Curated annotation (Swiss-Prot):
MF annotations from Gene Ontology: 4 iron, 4 sulfur cluster binding; ATP binding; metal ion binding; nitrogenase activity
Cofactor annotation comment: Binds 1 [4Fe-4S] cluster per dimer.
Gene name per UniProt: nifH
Protein name according to UniProt: Nitrogenase iron protein
Organism: Stutzerimonas stutzeri (strain A1501)
Keywords tagged on the record: 4Fe-4S, ADP-ribosylation, ATP-binding, Iron, Iron-sulfur, Metal-binding, Nitrogen fixation, Nucleotide-binding, Oxidoreductase
Family: Belongs to the NifH/BchL/ChlL family.
Length: 293
């Protein structure tokens, strides 16, 4: 099996890192060889696999050593649960420099040091927020990741971010091989959430590859710096991540998405009763103005 490179995008705080780590733990359980590359200055993309607060990042260690050329692969590549290989790109101090540059530096370093040659089945890039510009787009722009999965929910801004990410995918898909693999709905228990995300995926020309229900066992596992797969393998939530993993292994529906307009997104929310036309009449009105009206 050829190595598959997948990037996980989505709105900040939507649960990308948690979803990614539980997903790769399930893939490891299936006997897959996996590497996670954290592309976020917070360096929290591998903590549940390594049981650590935060992994030392390539950018931190390069600063200490002098340059990235002074690093060895074993300095930055750690192995955790299920023999999952873990790397964090890191970034500059807050307010200084471009964090996206860290992603570029990290991926180039990993390639030069042969990190991708270890008979891997999957590489997952866990990418900061919904930023698809500059360095954070590198997994897409440089054809590193061929499959993009977008984590979202039935909340308007999560859907808005997913649509924006699809616009970024289109930009690079036309000149490369990157494709959208599907939407992963990380439930926030909003009304008709699964139907809504399936409808959004359909409009984007894609699929909701899996609906991950909300369950407090995820938080209980996170407090222990563990995935649900490791913390409570018999939990129903662990089976949800296993199902997601199997669907990604078997996924053949890789598309160039068809992003929609803001008007179309609002129309979709109205169709599902999340917004109604009355909402449009109150846009820009203060509480006092609404009382007068």
């Amino acid at each position: 099996m050829a190595m598959r490179q997948c990037a996980i995008y989505g709105k900040g705080g939507i649960g990308k890192s948690t979803t990614t780590q539980n997903l790769v733990a399930a893939l490891a359980e299936l006997g897959k060889k996996v590497m996670i590359v954290g592309c976020d200055p917070k360096a929290d993309s591998t903590r549940l696999i390594l049981h650590s607060k935060a992994q030392n990042t390539i950018m931190e260690m390069a600063a200490e050593a002098g340059t990235v050329e002074d690093l060895e692969l074993e300095d930055v590549l750690k192995t955790g649960y299920g023999d999952i290989k873990c790397v964090e790109s890191g970034g500059p101090e807050p307010g200084v420099g471009c964090a996206g540059r860290g992603v570029i530096t990290a991926i180039n370093f990993l390639e030069e040091e042969g990190a991708y040659e270890d008979d891997l089945d999957f590489v997952f890039y866990d990418v900061l927020g919904d930023v698809v510009c500059g360095g954070f787009a590198m997994p897409i722009r440089e054809n590193k990741a061929q499959e993009i999965y977008v984590v979202c929910s039935g909340e308007m801004m999560a859907m808005y971010a997913a649509n924006n990410i699809c616009k970024g995918i289109v930009k690079y898909a036309n000149s490369g091989s990157v494709r959208l693999g599907g939407l992963i709905c990380n439930s926030r228990n909003t009304d008709r959430e699964d139907e809504l995300i399936m409808a959004l995926a359909d409009k984007l020309g894609s699929q909701m590859i899996h609906f991950v229900p909300r369950d407090n066992v995820v938080q209980r596992a996170e407090i222990r710096r563990m995935t649900v797969i490791e913390y409570d393998p018999a939990a129903k939530q662990a089976d949800e991540y296993r199902t997601l993993a199997k669907k990604i292994v078997e996924n053949k529906k890789l598309v160039i998405p068809t992003p929609i307009s803001m008007d179309e997104l609002e129309a979709l929310l109205m169709e599902f009763g999340i917004m109604d036309e009355e909402d449009m009449t109150i846009v820009g009105k203060t509480a006092a103005e609404e009382v007068v009206a």
